Amino acid sequence: IYRQDNWVATMRCPTTKFWGGEIYSKTNRFGRYQAHGTLEIMYDGAMENSGFPKKDNDNSTTKETGGWDWNVEAGSTTVHYTSWKEMMPNKNVTDRFDQYSKTTNFAGALAWKDCGMFGAEFDQDDSWGSQRFTPTNLTFKKSVYAFDGMLISLGSNISASGSYSDDMITATNLF
Protein backbone atom coordinates (compact mmCIF):
# COMPACT_ATOMS: atom_id res chain seq x y z
CA ILE A 1 0.00 0.00 0.00
CA TYR A 2 1.36 3.42 -0.99
CA ARG A 3 -0.45 6.53 0.25
CA GLN A 4 -0.41 10.12 -0.96
CA ASP A 5 -2.52 13.19 -0.07
CA ASN A 6 -5.63 12.30 -2.08
CA TRP A 7 -4.97 8.74 -3.33
CA VAL A 8 -3.78 5.31 -2.27
CA ALA A 9 -2.30 2.52 -4.41
CA THR A 10 -2.63 -1.16 -3.55
CA MET A 11 -0.75 -4.03 -5.17
CA ARG A 12 -1.73 -7.72 -4.99
CA CYS A 13 -0.66 -11.08 -6.36
CA PRO A 14 -1.54 -14.63 -5.28
CA THR A 15 1.03 -17.19 -4.14
CA THR A 16 0.77 -20.90 -3.42
CA LYS A 17 -0.55 -19.98 0.04
CA PHE A 18 -2.56 -16.80 -0.64
CA TRP A 19 -5.43 -16.85 -3.09
CA GLY A 20 -6.39 -14.03 -5.38
CA GLY A 21 -10.11 -14.47 -5.86
CA GLU A 22 -13.01 -16.49 -4.53
CA ILE A 23 -15.61 -17.64 -7.03
CA TYR A 24 -18.94 -18.86 -5.68
CA SER A 25 -22.03 -20.32 -7.33
CA LYS A 26 -24.16 -17.16 -7.23
CA THR A 27 -21.61 -14.39 -6.68
CA ASN A 28 -18.35 -13.26 -8.25
CA ARG A 29 -18.59 -15.72 -11.15
CA PHE A 30 -16.18 -13.63 -13.23
CA GLY A 31 -13.71 -12.75 -10.45
CA ARG A 32 -10.89 -14.82 -11.87
CA TYR A 33 -8.32 -12.01 -12.18
CA GLN A 34 -8.97 -10.07 -8.97
CA ALA A 35 -5.35 -10.15 -7.85
CA HIS A 36 -3.20 -11.13 -10.84
CA GLY A 37 -0.49 -8.58 -10.12
CA THR A 38 -3.07 -5.83 -9.73
CA LEU A 39 -2.13 -2.21 -9.11
CA GLU A 40 -5.24 -0.31 -8.12
CA ILE A 41 -5.31 3.42 -7.43
CA MET A 42 -8.18 4.77 -5.35
CA TYR A 43 -8.88 8.51 -5.21
CA ASP A 44 -10.74 10.57 -2.61
CA GLY A 45 -14.44 11.08 -3.16
CA ALA A 46 -16.94 9.09 -5.17
CA MET A 47 -16.05 5.63 -6.49
CA GLU A 48 -16.35 6.97 -10.04
CA ASN A 49 -13.18 9.00 -9.37
CA SER A 50 -11.33 5.67 -9.22
CA GLY A 51 -12.82 4.21 -12.40
CA PHE A 52 -15.82 2.34 -11.01
CA PRO A 53 -19.10 2.45 -12.98
CA LYS A 54 -21.02 5.69 -12.62
CA LYS A 55 -24.45 5.58 -11.05
CA ASP A 56 -27.24 7.87 -12.26
CA ASN A 57 -30.50 8.67 -10.56
CA ASP A 58 -33.47 7.96 -12.81
CA ASN A 59 -36.95 8.45 -11.32
CA SER A 60 -35.80 7.71 -7.76
CA THR A 61 -33.99 4.52 -8.79
CA THR A 62 -30.25 4.18 -8.98
CA LYS A 63 -28.78 2.39 -11.96
CA GLU A 64 -25.29 1.88 -13.25
CA THR A 65 -24.50 3.42 -16.61
CA GLY A 66 -21.30 1.46 -17.11
CA GLY A 67 -19.87 -1.87 -16.16
CA TRP A 68 -16.79 -3.47 -14.75
CA ASP A 69 -14.81 -5.64 -17.16
CA TRP A 70 -13.28 -8.46 -15.12
CA ASN A 71 -10.87 -9.17 -17.99
CA VAL A 72 -9.05 -5.89 -17.44
CA GLU A 73 -8.71 -5.41 -13.70
CA ALA A 74 -6.53 -2.34 -13.08
CA GLY A 75 -2.85 -3.18 -13.42
CA SER A 76 -3.47 -6.93 -13.72
CA THR A 77 -1.95 -9.29 -16.26
CA THR A 78 -4.70 -11.35 -17.88
CA VAL A 79 -5.77 -13.40 -20.85
CA HIS A 80 -8.57 -11.36 -22.43
CA TYR A 81 -11.55 -13.62 -22.89
CA THR A 82 -13.87 -12.75 -25.77
CA SER A 83 -16.87 -14.54 -24.26
CA TRP A 84 -18.27 -14.19 -20.74
CA LYS A 85 -19.28 -17.86 -20.90
CA GLU A 86 -15.65 -18.90 -21.49
CA MET A 87 -14.56 -16.92 -18.45
CA MET A 88 -16.77 -18.91 -16.05
CA PRO A 89 -15.49 -22.07 -14.32
CA ASN A 90 -16.02 -25.12 -16.56
CA LYS A 91 -18.78 -27.60 -15.78
CA ASN A 92 -19.31 -26.22 -12.32
CA VAL A 93 -21.95 -23.86 -11.05
CA THR A 94 -22.00 -24.74 -7.37
CA ASP A 95 -18.49 -25.10 -5.94
CA ARG A 96 -16.23 -22.40 -4.59
CA PHE A 97 -13.00 -21.89 -6.50
CA ASP A 98 -9.92 -20.08 -5.19
CA GLN A 99 -7.22 -18.86 -7.57
CA TYR A 100 -3.70 -19.78 -6.41
CA SER A 101 -0.28 -19.71 -7.99
CA LYS A 102 0.83 -23.19 -9.11
CA THR A 103 4.46 -23.29 -7.93
CA THR A 104 5.77 -19.79 -7.27
CA ASN A 105 5.52 -18.47 -3.77
CA PHE A 106 6.84 -14.94 -4.12
CA ALA A 107 4.81 -11.79 -3.60
CA GLY A 108 5.73 -9.12 -1.11
CA ALA A 109 6.46 -5.51 -0.36
CA LEU A 110 8.91 -3.42 1.62
CA ALA A 111 8.68 0.16 2.83
CA TRP A 112 11.37 2.60 3.93
CA LYS A 113 10.24 6.04 5.06
CA ASP A 114 8.12 7.43 2.20
CA CYS A 115 9.39 4.95 -0.42
CA GLY A 116 8.36 1.39 -1.16
CA MET A 117 8.59 -1.53 -3.52
CA PHE A 118 6.45 -4.53 -4.44
CA GLY A 119 7.49 -7.66 -6.29
CA ALA A 120 5.71 -10.81 -7.45
CA GLU A 121 6.20 -13.91 -9.56
CA PHE A 122 3.16 -15.89 -10.70
CA ASP A 123 2.28 -19.04 -12.62
CA GLN A 124 -1.41 -19.77 -12.94
CA ASP A 125 -3.04 -22.96 -11.74
CA ASP A 126 -6.27 -23.56 -13.64
CA SER A 127 -7.48 -26.44 -11.48
CA TRP A 128 -8.60 -26.98 -7.93
CA GLY A 129 -9.32 -30.66 -7.51
CA SER A 130 -10.36 -30.74 -11.17
CA GLN A 131 -9.86 -28.46 -14.16
CA ARG A 132 -11.98 -25.33 -13.77
CA PHE A 133 -10.87 -23.19 -16.70
CA THR A 134 -9.42 -23.73 -20.14
CA PRO A 135 -5.71 -23.76 -19.25
CA THR A 136 -3.88 -20.57 -20.19
CA ASN A 137 -0.61 -21.29 -18.35
CA LEU A 138 -0.33 -17.56 -17.58
CA THR A 139 2.99 -16.51 -16.06
CA PHE A 140 4.55 -13.17 -15.19
CA LYS A 141 7.01 -11.31 -12.99
CA LYS A 142 6.14 -7.81 -11.76
CA SER A 143 7.62 -5.08 -9.64
CA VAL A 144 6.41 -1.65 -8.59
CA TYR A 145 8.62 1.07 -7.12
CA ALA A 146 6.95 3.93 -5.25
CA PHE A 147 8.70 7.22 -4.46
CA ASP A 148 8.10 10.98 -4.73
CA GLY A 149 4.40 10.45 -5.49
CA MET A 150 5.22 8.25 -8.51
CA LEU A 151 4.68 4.56 -9.25
CA ILE A 152 7.12 2.84 -11.61
CA SER A 153 5.71 -0.53 -12.70
CA LEU A 154 7.78 -3.14 -14.55
CA GLY A 155 6.82 -6.54 -15.94
CA SER A 156 8.80 -9.37 -17.51
CA ASN A 157 8.48 -13.02 -18.53
CA ILE A 158 4.80 -12.41 -19.40
CA SER A 159 3.37 -15.33 -21.35
CA ALA A 160 0.36 -17.57 -21.79
CA SER A 161 -0.26 -20.68 -23.87
CA GLY A 162 -3.11 -23.09 -24.25
CA SER A 163 -5.84 -24.45 -26.49
CA TYR A 164 -7.93 -21.29 -26.59
CA SER A 165 -8.90 -19.07 -29.51
CA ASP A 166 -6.34 -16.82 -31.21
CA ASP A 167 -8.37 -13.68 -30.46
CA MET A 168 -7.71 -14.07 -26.72
CA ILE A 169 -4.67 -11.87 -26.13
CA THR A 170 -2.43 -11.71 -23.07
CA ALA A 171 -1.87 -8.20 -21.74
CA THR A 172 -1.03 -6.14 -18.70
CA ASN A 173 -3.93 -3.75 -18.29
CA LEU A 174 -3.36 -0.05 -17.76
CA PHE A 175 -5.85 2.31 -16.20
Residue locations for each model-derived region?
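Catalytic and substrate-binding regions of extracellular carbohydrate-active enzymes
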Residues: I1-F175
